[in-house]
């Protein structure tokens, strides 16, 4: 149900987020249909109950219409509207916990409405109970969807049918949820220490350079003894030798991701792209794109291991 938006941009409602996602479109359509069936049936049942009010019990076996059912109808309407707004605004990752809580409360109300109407012999009340049953089935599916993590297999399978599911859906959650910590240090994020040969370090007691220094320390002028003169080594530094990084894991992108423009360590990738991963510990994985061999870090909740 996620859709794209510019990095750090304001969330805007777009019907394309619903129309482009078969799961969102189907469940919202069914819920609206179930709600209209329930609402119209409750109106008819309420009119019939008011008409039969004051009659003996034998002429009015169903009694008064339960007011509780109206509260369930109104709550269900706000529940559906809330889901539509959250999905259309591409704010699922921001409000999925709140939506799950509201859905759980709605499940209690809807099933209670079924219990108060399903045993009646009145056709309108039975139709209202049928609408509540259909609505409760949609609510159960929504609770499972919104309560699951994006990397879970069922949710990733449902999201894979979306026509346009791009980068911004979980970018802010990934940045805020991680709080800028727990990110692996990569060759792009930290400059490795300089590597020196023994000849370059001749005469130094502590050969360790300052981490991150871009130039080797200048050798001091050494004293002269007789004909033997200690000359500073003006030889250029040997080329930096870094151990090769293995990428033993393969991961598939379940969402597209757009790298933060202010962070050169992140890489962008598209949905369903296969990445080579060097380490799967932590919340950010060092990955390499195939074809371009671009290396950087990627949020683990956008990827699923193969």
Swiss-Prot record:
Membrane spanning residue stretches: 24-44, 68-88, 97-117, 127-147
Source species of the chain: Metarhizium robertsii (strain ARSEF 23 / ATCC MYA-3075) (Metarhizium anisopliae (strain ARSEF 23))
Which gene name does the record give? MOS1
Which coarse location class describes where this protein primarily resides? membrane
Stretches assigned to coiled coil: none
Spell out the protein name for this chain.
High osmolarity signaling protein MOS1
Membrane topology summary: Multi-pass membrane protein
State which ranges are Extracellular (membrane side).
Answer: 45-67, 118-126
InterPro entries attached to this UniProt entry: SH3-like_dom_sf, SH3_domain, Sho1_SH3
Bias regions of kind Polar residues — which residues?
224-235
């Amino acid at each position: 149900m996620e859709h794209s938006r510019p990095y750090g941009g304001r969330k805007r409602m777009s019907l394309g987020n619903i129309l482009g996602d078969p799961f969102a479109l189907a469940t919202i359509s069914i819920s609206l249909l179930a709600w209209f069936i329930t609402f119209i049936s409750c109106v008819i049942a309420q009119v019939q109950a008011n008409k039969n009010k004051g009659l003996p019990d034998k002429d009015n076996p169903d009694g008064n219409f339960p007011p509780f059912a109206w509260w369930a109808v109104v709550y269900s309407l706000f529940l559906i509207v809330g889901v539509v707004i959250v999905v259309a605004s591409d704010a699922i990752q921001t409000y999925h916990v709140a939506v799950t809580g509201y859905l759980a409360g709605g499940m209690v109300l809807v099933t209670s409405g079924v219990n108060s109407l399903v045993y009646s012999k009145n056709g309108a009340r039975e139709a209202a109970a049928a609408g509540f049953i259909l609505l409760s089935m949609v609510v159960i599916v929504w609770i499972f969807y919104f309560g699951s993590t994006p990397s879970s297999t069922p949710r990733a399978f449902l999201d894979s049918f979306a026509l346009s599911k791009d980068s911004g859906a979980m970018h802010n959650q990934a940045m805020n949820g991680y709080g800028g910590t727990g990110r692996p240090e990569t060759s792009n994020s930290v400059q490795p220490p300089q590597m020196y040969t023994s000849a370059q370090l001749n005469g130094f007691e502590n050969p360790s350079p300052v981490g991150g220094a871009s130039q080797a320390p200048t050798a001091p002028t050494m004293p002269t003894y007789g004909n033997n003169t200690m000359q500073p080594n003006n030889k250029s530094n040997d080329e930096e030798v870094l151990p090769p990084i293995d990428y033993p894991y393969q991961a598939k992108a379940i969402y597209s991701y757009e790298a933060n423009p202010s962070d050169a360590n992140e890489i962008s990738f598209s949905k369903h792209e296969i990445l080579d991963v060097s380490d799967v510990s932590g919340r950010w994985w060092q990955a390499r794109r195939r074809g371009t061999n671009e290396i950087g870090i990627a949020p683990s909740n956008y990827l699923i291991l193969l």
